[in-house]
């Protein structure tokens, strides 16, 4: 079962690239972030033409997440079910069950600056993700895969130059501790199960030739419950999709599991 996460940074701007990539790579489940469109504008028909069902949770010019599947799309749910009465104000998470695997497509808030309200929102959001998983899944027995743009580099290996990011978001102790809380539920960052070295990134700024200078961060993550993680065959960042004309600033992360 091939599960992919990809922040496309505007699906409207990159739909042709996404279609070509799907045709070439044949994911079973493709989770998109930053679609930047309303639900009414989402091109379900174009994915149907490729043999995929799709679900979308969007709001317009910002945010937006989707799950696109050729192996079934059931129990679709946007937002959190964590027992709180306040819904997430942004379109940032979409859940679906695909061939028996519970999948979440996540676009974690950026945080902006450490002293900004958006940073506090980010930490709260990650806490809500933890609480939703704790309340609605059993990671010890259920195949669950949580993917997306987490806007957090799990450790210093995931940042091209850690000293350049001191005091900035994406690398702070509270953000990283929020990811560790997910791991405390039993979830595994499957990329780090296969690759230990530094310098393997999934995002590069458009400016200053950052991609070709390898000045990036690994913030697009795949977390798997024990059942799913034990079935991992391989995981890879598709750097080639960051090349060419009008790419996203993120590359797809492809994870293959022996689950179907």
Give, region by region, the residue ranges found by the protein language model.
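Metal-dependent phosphoester-hydrolase catalytic domains
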Residues: 39, 48, 76-81, 155-260
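Short, Asp-centered acidic motifs that coordinate Mg2+ and/or phosphate
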Residues: 28-29, 143-145, 221
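Surface-exposed cleft-lining segments at the edges of enzyme active sites
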Residues: 81-84, 108-127, 163-167
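Catalytic metal-binding/acid-base residues of hydrolase active sites
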Residues: 9, 36, 107-109, 151-153, ...
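Structured beta-strand-rich core segments of catalytic domains in phosphoester-bond hydrolases
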Residues: 35-38, 42-113
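N-terminal, active-site-proximal structural segment of metallo-dependent hydrolase catalytic domains
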Residues: 1-56, 62-65, 154
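Active-site-proximal beta-strand elements of phosphoester/diester hydrolases
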Residues: 1-10, 100-115, 147, 250
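Acidic/histidine-rich, metal-coordinating catalytic segments
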Residues: 142-156
């Amino acid at each position: 079962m091939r599960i992919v996460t990809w922040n496309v940074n505007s699906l409207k701007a990159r739909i042709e690239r996404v279609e070509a990539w799907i045709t070439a790579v044949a994911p079973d489940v493709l989770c998109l972030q930053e679609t930047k469109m309303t639900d009414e504008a989402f091109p379900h028909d174009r994915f149907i033409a490729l043999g995929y069902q799709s679900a979308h949770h969007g709001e317009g010019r910002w945010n937006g997440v989707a799950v696109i599947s050729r192996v079934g799309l059931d129990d679709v749910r946007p937002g959190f079910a964590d027992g709180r009465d306040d819904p997430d104000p942004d379109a940032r998470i979409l859940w679906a069950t695909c061939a028996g695997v519970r999948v979440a497509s996540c676009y974690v808030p950026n945080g902006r600056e450490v002293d900004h309200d958006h940073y506090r929102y980010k930490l709260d959001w990650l806490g809500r993700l933890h609480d939703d998983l704790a309340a609605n899944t059993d990671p010890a027995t259920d195949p669950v895969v949580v993917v997306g743009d987490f806007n957090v580099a799990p450790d210093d290996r995931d940042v091209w130059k850690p000293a350049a990011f001191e005091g900035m978001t994406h690398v702070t102790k509270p953000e990283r501790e929020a990811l560790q809380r997910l791991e405390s539920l039993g979830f595994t960052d499957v990329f780090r199960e296969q690759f230990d070295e530094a310098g393997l990134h999934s995002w590069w700024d458009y400016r200053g030739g950052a991609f070709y200078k390898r000045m990036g961060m690994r913030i697009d993550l795949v977390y798997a419950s024990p059942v799913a993680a034990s079935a991992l065959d391989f995981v890879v960042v598709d750097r080639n999709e960051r090349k060419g004309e009008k790419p996203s600033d993120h590359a797809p992360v492809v994870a293959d599991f022996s689950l179907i």
